[in-house]
Each structure stands twice: as structure tokens, then as C-alpha cells.
Amino acid sequence: MAAAIASGLIRQKRQAREQHWDRPSASRRRSSPSKNRGLCNGNLVDIFSKVRIFGLKKRRLRRQDPQLKGIVTRLYCRQGYYLQMHPDGALDGTKDDSTNSTLFNLIPVGLRVVAIQGVKTGLYIAMNGEGYLYPSELFTPECKFKESVFENYYVIYSSMLYRQQESGRAWFLGLNKEGQAMKGNRVKKTKPAAHFLPKPLEVAMYREPSLHDVGETVPKPGVTPSKSTSASAIMNGGKPVNKSKTT
């Protein structure tokens, strides 16, 4: 009997010991579900904010990338000259097709609308309200030309801003028989003076030029920017024109 009792006690002690080890420790505390949820939400917010910042940076970089596909080209006039822009911005024609002054960036700025920029000078070809061509440091509405293919597959460039008031006839970019730049209102689209043949050299990507007001000048150090007319920049075959002179 005693042996049975002893073995029973031993069995009870062993069971008690096993139950003690199986019981979870008081020091082990379950973490609160709300606390876990808070940590999870915090991590998600951190991840989303990082993704958003990365997306904004990527979008800014994408905006800075060149978006417009244009061409570097020479413009051959049917009069027998290549259009050229001199270092001072004067425009005329030359028969020499090897000079860099005949290279132009043809940048699309609208549907069948282009900006014509000298590669060496960085100046835009512009046409003012009197039909004169002049070089512009800034891209303005006067620098926009409509590009149209004529019947003979030559291309004509007309001002997007100016035309004859009565007839509505467009004003065109043109060279005369001597290779001098003509007034836009004197150029007829049916004449060789207005007919150009682009001779592309390469395709290039361009950033969209910022549009400025007509007459706005490039600010210089210590000089207040003005919005006066661009009379000083007006050219006629490379010579300054007096605006007060009637045509």
C-alpha cells in the first residue's frame, strides 16, 4: 500500500512539474492587437510616403527630359540658296552648303507649326508686324511658323501671327534672287522665293521652348527687363530697318 501511495505521490509530483513547464510564463505577454495594427499602419505610411517622393522625383526628371522630336536640317530655297544665319543673327542665303551657319533646328511647337532656330547662334527666326525677319533670343509668338507642303513638294513657312488684313493672305519666309531675306508680305506662296526644301541631317529631341511675350528681352545683369518693341532687332537682308519709315 505504501509503495502504491509513494508511486502515486511521485506520479502527482511529476504531473505537477510537467504542468508547470507547460504553463506560459508570466513574463511572456501577448502584444496588443491594436499596438501591432498601429505599427503596421506606421510602416505602410512610411512606405507610401517614400513611394510618393520617388514618384514626384521621377515625374520632375521626366518633365526635364527632351519631349519634342525635331530635326537638324539645312533649308534649301528654290532660288538656289541655302538659308543661313550669321553670328549677329542676320539672315540671307548662301550657295555654300558646308558652313555651319546654314544649320537650323526645326522644332515642332504645335500641329504643323515649327520654330526655326539657328544651331550655332541659338537664335530663333521671327517675323514682326511689318513683315521683317529678325533674330530673337526668346521664343515668342512671332517665332511660330506654319509648315505646309506645296504642290511641288517644296515646303513653305508662313507666320502664325500676321497676314494681310484685307485679303487674309499669309506672310511667308522667303529669299529673293540675290539671296536676301524678303519682307513676308512681299512673298507669294506660288513663287520660288517661298519654296524651301529641308535637307535633314539628323533627328534630335528638344525641350519645349518657353513662350515669352513679343518684345520681351533677355534680362542682363544690373538691367531692368523691358517689354519695349523689338525695333532694334528688326532686320532686312541683314540691315537694320527704321520702323518710322513707311513701306
From Swiss-Prot:
What spans are recorded as compositionally biased (Basic and acidic residues)? Answer: 15-25
Region (Disordered) residue ranges read 1-38, 214-247
Record keywords: Glycoprotein included?
no
Any one GO molecular-function label of the UniProt entry: growth factor activity
Gene3D superfamilies, A to Z: 2.80.10.50
Q: Which domain of life is it from?
A: Eukaryota
Could you tell me what this protein does? Probably involved in nervous system development and function.
One Pfam family in the UniProt entry: FGF
Location in or out of the cell: Nucleus
Which medical condition is this protein associated with? Answer: Spinocerebellar ataxia 27A: A form of spinocerebellar ataxia, a clinically and genetically heterogeneous group of cerebellar disorders. Patients show progressive incoordination of gait and often poor coordination of hands, speech and eye movements, due to degeneration of the cerebellum with variable involvement of the brainstem and spinal cord. SCA27A is an autosomal dominant, slowly progressive form characterized by gait disturbances, ataxia with tremor, dysarthria, orofacial dyskinesia, gaze-evoked nystagmus, and learning disabilities. Spinocerebellar ataxia 27B, late-onset: A form of spinocerebellar ataxia, a clinically and genetically heterogeneous group of cerebellar disorders. Patients show progressive incoordination of gait and often poor coordination of hands, speech and eye movements, due to degeneration of the cerebellum with variable involvement of the brainstem and spinal cord. SCA27B is an autosomal dominant, slowly progressive form characterized by the onset of gait and appendicular ataxia in adulthood.
Does Nucleus appear among the keywords? Answer: yes
Tissue-level expression reads:
Nervous system.
Family indicated by similarity: Belongs to the heparin-binding growth factors family.
Describe its assembly.
Answer: Interacts with SCN8A.
GO cellular component terms, alphabetically, are:
cytoplasm; nucleus
Cross-referenced InterPro entries: Fibroblast_GF_fam, IL1/FGF
**Protein's name in the database:** Fibroblast growth factor 14
Biological-process GO terms, alphabetical: cell-cell signaling; JNK cascade; nervous system development; neurogenesis; signal transduction
Species name for this entry? Homo sapiens
